[in-house]
Amino acid sequence: MKKIAVDAMGGDYAPQAIVEGVNQALSDFSDIEVQLYGDEAKIKQYLTATERVSIIHTDEKIDSDDEPTRAIRNKKNASMVLAAKAVKDGEADAVLSAGNTGALLAAGFFIVGRIKNIDRPGLMSTLPTVDGKGFDMLDLGANAENTAQHLHQYAVLGSFYAKNVRGIAQPRVGLLNNGTESSKGDPLRKETYELLVADESLNFIGNVEARDLMNGVADVVVADGFTGNAVLKSIEGTAMGIMGLLKTAITGGGLRAKLGALLLKDSLRGLKKQLNYSDVGGAVLFGVKAPVVKTHGSSDAKAVYSTIRQIRTMLETDVVAQTAREFSGE
């Protein structure tokens, strides 16, 4: 049985969206058990599942504006902290939260703990491409600064994930840069390039540019945390902008535009779904001793369900243990 500790109080629509997503996951997956951490009375309002689920009550939670590290240290009974401790103590196999990203990263670093020989765990997510296959990118902001050695580790981590969780036999690994030529980039990018070229275990395809990411140029894209987070926000903003422009064009375009939208309704719905990468799951803090997964703060029940499905696959494929063995040299 795969045991998942869930912070029921994190996120914009908690606990309703969290619990409703859990209900659906428990219905569909008979091999998971969920521990819900949070306000028992509020959780029970939405909990319909009666088997393989438990509630661990706490009145304390971490708010979105709390300073991450201080919150983890001072709010010992917060729902997120208790969920992370359950993983550390072996009472759960993975932790999920839609709450404060920085606090969850801190919980992953300081409570769950790093895998031996991994210097800086990175935040990774599967982002959308035009062909619907997506690409994995890390680091998306777990670290403000990185070395070439960190980026090399991210390439190995991302490749492991793409192989074992997404089923890609030979993941194409690209280094995000300001040009595709091998001579491009600052000293960090140039040093990283040399490390990736020298690693024969990687299917390294060279430098990739941000403009080509959504065209599926690579299966795994490696970046420092600052750059990766900026790219992530750009993709999110572009997706919202496209949908906003379409809505404005339709509502302000008169009868012809509305009729056209009606005819294209299924296609537009498909486009919206394709741009909504939360259907794939959450962002994984990769490099810690167990799956620590952050679903978007505005996640609805469907996104929570998708993230639980993602965690289930990670546990099923034992990707974290495989990664630990690889980095420990066993």
From Swiss-Prot:
Coarsely, its chief localization is cytoplasm
Entry's Gene Ontology molecular function annotations: phosphate:acyl-[acyl carrier protein] acyltransferase activity
Kindly give the InterPro entries that the UniProt entry links to this protein: FA_synthesis, Phospholipid_synth_PlsX-like
Pathways involved: Lipid metabolism; phospholipid metabolism
Q: Which Pfam families match?
A: FA_synthesis
Biological role:
Catalyzes the reversible formation of acyl-phosphate (acyl-PO(4)) from acyl-[acyl-carrier-protein] (acyl-ACP). This enzyme utilizes acyl-ACP as fatty acyl donor, but not acyl-CoA.
Q: Which family does it belong to?
A: Belongs to the PlsX family.
Name it: Phosphate acyltransferase
Gene field: plsX
